Amino acid sequence: MKKISLPKIGIRPVIDGRRMGVRESLEEQTMNMAKATAALITEKIRHACGAQVECVIADTCIAGMAESAACEEKFSSQNVGVTITVTPCWCYGSETIDMDPMRPKAIWGFNGTERPGAVYLAAALAAHSQKGIPAFSIYGHDVQDADDTSIPADVEEKLLRFARAGLAVASMKGKSYLSVGGVSMGIAGSIVDHNFFESWLGMKVQAVDMTELRRRIDQKIYDEAELEMALAWADKNFRYGEDQNASQYKRNEAQNRAVLKESLLMAMCIRDMMQGNKTLADKGLVEESLGYNAIAAGFQGQRHWTDQYPNGDTAEALLNSSFDWNGVREPFVVATENDSLNGVAMLFGHQLTGTAQIFADVRTYWSPEAVERVTGQALSALAEHGIIHLINSGSAALDGACKQRDSEGKPTMKPHWEISQQEADACLAATEWCPAIHEYFRGGGYSSRFLTEGGVPFTMTRVNIIKGLGPVLQIAEGWSVELPKAMHDQLDARTNSTWPTTWFAPRLIGKGPFTDVYSVMANWGANHGVLTIGHVGADFITLAAMLRIPVCMHNVEEAKIYRPSAWAAHGMDIEGQDYRACQNYGPLYKR
């Protein structure tokens, strides 16, 4: 099967078309802007899979309709999914702009005095606004000399933020969300909304009953040699935690082995269903070998599967991690309980950062007073205003233990292409696998148990769908918190100590839903959330604007908010602008 090519970024150098000295004097400077932009993006950004981003530059500078059409023909043949137009001078606005309505686009107008790059930028953006095709504006804060080929820091920040978000949009388009099962325990996010995926993300939904997973396991529609490798890997690396089940529910060694085997098979088969596996074709299973072209998936599990078969905890945790028996690799995106909306938040985070994502219940708000009452100890430092307990039995990536280290030796979660095998092993060593609690999971299973290291910056997100409004995005930047061991043990024991825990302290800004930690919890729109490494809320905001998803809650500094220029015409309140613009333009792929 032919591999689907990755989207590219097209660079469009536009120029004043007047000959007899004007165009000729600008050719080199204009093309050099395009080359510098391409070099910056190629150096600084990778696709979520780890591949280097490829930029395609128009063959000539673009002065009018003919050269614009020639550029578009080239881009169409090379899978260009995002465009950046660059110029140091005046050009002919609507004659030179990118008119593809579904392709994210930005314009960098050079801030210089010799030629009016800012004037073209304003004219072109006016054309975009009038035609209903929003574009992002890039204009340096400080004037540069005409022969200055450097890219200022503020311009670089906008170029890279736009490129990251634009590539996420282009990478999701044409892919599918694999819904394995249906609605889990009445959770609204697992009522998978096909219109949302199609109209806002440009994706399809592939709905598959959980009996397909059962069929693949029972009929050995998997790589049997790989199963043996996975079992050997688990035997070497899994540490098993306390079995908290009553004696009548404890399994013997043979039963536990069967649960482990089926859990690993679930991981293999869900992966094969998502992306395909050519080994199956070698076994004569050509249809099954193709997969469903899924960039994200969800597994219902509870309760129609878990009342009889091992739960999805092990499979989900391993798939969402950056490593398994095959070594370090790109993490998958698999949502527990088929919560497709949390799965989309995971997908956004992975596409923007290349890292694994932590799926969690937004379980409990602990006030400083409640913590002191229960433990006799006071919260301090990052936790002084209270904490939120993020915990779930299922698909928290093992990277979430934060045993990887950044360039300063601090705990983090790295893009998979930066993770060493030693760091992967450290995450495994920090994880215990605890037998599932029988009352919840009658078919058994193993839940991963780890504790996220403290002081790590995270961004918590969630997508919700509001009837009459559509999808909205919530964002809360903050930090993981390390509690004294005795305090952690007491608080953890009050819920389920066999599950992975992250203690989270959102950054407070003294107003709205970020007045205090309680308000963050009270304003969260659903029972699940996602943690993405770093304070990357600004990237989420830019991505959401491209997709026309308004942001209903965030604590990102206003100076970092980057949306299309047309948003400014939708009122003076920056968040009201977002709602009005998203309503005005409608979903990116509306029909």
Curated annotation (Swiss-Prot):
GO terms for molecular function: arabinose isomerase activity; L-fucose isomerase activity; manganese ion binding. It catalyses: L-fucose = L-fuculose. Mn(2+) binds at residues 337, 361, 528. This is L-fucose isomerase. One of its GO terms (biological process) is D-arabinose catabolic process. HAMAP family: Fucose_iso. Belongs to the L-fucose isomerase family. It is found in: Cytoplasm. It is an enzyme of class 5 (isomerase). The gene is fucI. SUPFAM superfamilies: FucI/AraA C-terminal domain-like (SSF50443), FucI/AraA N-terminal and middle domains (SSF53743). Keywords: Carbohydrate metabolism, Cytoplasm, Fucose metabolism, Isomerase, Manganese, Metal-binding. It holds the Pfam family Fucose_iso_C. It comes from Salmonella typhi.
